[in-house]
């Protein structure tokens, strides 16, 4: 069984630019590979990066990065162009939705299960905006909003999880952390103390 109860479970992604090496990080990149009227075909993550690098050799790929920056202006239209020159205009939120659905589908395939609830971290100052948009984009899921982690705290929890997993902590010792979260045009700085007990 791939899905392990009471543990952090990761979805590895194949980095097609590095001989299909597994990576736990997926680039927030979306490439447009087909435009047929309202029907837009996308590629995501490493495949989008690969197509972006090909576009320097073979013009015609439309690739988007920094999707998180779009949350504040999600209704804005983006022009999409495929390799054959077909064009259309798509709201940014539709591109974001396609990316999120891809990420969820990767997890569904990996763990062979369906999801009813999801948690998406967000920049601390933009949580309400992210919650509102993601609830609109993914109405079929219950989005954790009341206890939604900001991105900096999510990174800290991941670090604590690694300390526990690798037994790299002293039981009961007080640790201090400085969290510097840079992204999407803002930098958040916070500090905390925490203790791990068995």
Q: Across the structure, where does each feature detected by a protein language model lie?
A:
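Gly/Thr-rich phosphate-binding beta-strand-loop-beta motif of the actin/hexokinase/Hsp70
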Residues: 1-6, 163-198
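Short regulatory "switch" loops immediately downstream of catalytic or recognition motifs
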Residues: 32-36, 72-82, 154-166, 191-198
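Hydrophobic, small-residue-rich alpha-helical packing segments that form membrane-like cores
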Residues: 105-114, 124, 130, 134-176, ...
């Amino acid at each position: 069984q791939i899905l392990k109860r009471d543990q952090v479970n990761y979805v590895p992604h194949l980095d097609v630019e590095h001989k299909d090496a597994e990576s736990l990080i997926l680039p927030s990149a979306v490439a447009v590979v087909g435009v047929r009227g309202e029907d837009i075909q996308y590629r995501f993550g490493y495949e989008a990066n690969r197509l972006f690098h090909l576009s320097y050799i073979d013009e015609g790929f439309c690739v988007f990065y920094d999707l998180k920056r779009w949350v504040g202006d999600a209704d804005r239209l983006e022009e999409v162009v495929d390799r054959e020159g077909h064009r259309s205009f798509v709201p940014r939120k539709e591109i974001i939705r396609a990316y999120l659905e891809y990420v969820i589908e990767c997890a569904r395939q990996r763990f062979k299960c369906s999801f009813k609830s999801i948690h998406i971290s967000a920049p601390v100052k933009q949580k309400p905006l992210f919650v509102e948009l993601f609830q609109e984009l993914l109405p079929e899921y219950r989005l954790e909003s009341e206890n939604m982690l900001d991105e900096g705290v999510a990174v800290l929890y991941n670090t604590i999880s690694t300390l526990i997993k690798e037994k790299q902590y002293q039981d009961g010792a007080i640790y201090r952390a400085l969290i510097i979260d840079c992204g999407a045009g803002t930098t958040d700085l916070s500090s905390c103390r925490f203790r791990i007990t068995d």
